[in-house]
């Protein structure tokens, strides 16, 4: 069995956001659950039946490997990052009248997009390495 909280902790360890620490526990868990549900639909996460879970006990009814926990946590971080990249406020700030604000916000948006792309590549690389190691070709 893999507890949701195990995956939540792995994802939170990769995020530095003081606002998350200020959220009530119930709100944070709700957000983490949403990010986890987004992450399990990614096609690059092992051969698991993620529908085999117990929402009351907040666990998957099978063990998820350490490597796949890492991949899921990366996709959870991407789910946390996605709304920030698509933020209307940020977009409005990028296209505001002041040039200095434009460049500062545009750079921030570019950095967040680059971070998202790097996280995607990291997850893909972990998946590919696991595929190569476990395919039986080298046995």
Regions found by a protein language model. Give the residues of each.
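Divalent metal-cofactor coordination and adjacent catalytic microenvironments
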Residues: 30-100, 106
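Conserved short "hinge" loops at termini or chain/domain junctions
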Residues: 1-63, 125-139
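Amphipathic alpha-helical binding modules
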Residues: 99-131
């Amino acid at each position: 069995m893999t507890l949701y909280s195990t995956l939540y902790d792995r994802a939170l360890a990769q995020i530095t956001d003081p606002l998350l620490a200020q959220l009530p526990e119930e709100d944070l868990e709700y957000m983490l659950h949403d990010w986890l549900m987004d992450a399990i639909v990614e096609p690059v996460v092992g051969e698991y039946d993620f529908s085999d879970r117990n929402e009351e006990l907040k666990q998957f009814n099978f063990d998820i490997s350490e490597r796949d926990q890492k991949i899921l946590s990366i996709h959870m971080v991407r789910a946390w990052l996605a709304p920030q990249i698509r933020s209307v406020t940020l977009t409005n700030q990028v296209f505001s009248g002041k040039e200095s604000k434009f460049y500062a916000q545009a750079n921030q948006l570019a950095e967040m997009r680059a971070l998202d792309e790097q996280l995607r590549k990291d997850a893909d690389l972990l998946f590919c390495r696991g595929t190569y190691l476990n395919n039986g070709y080298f046995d």
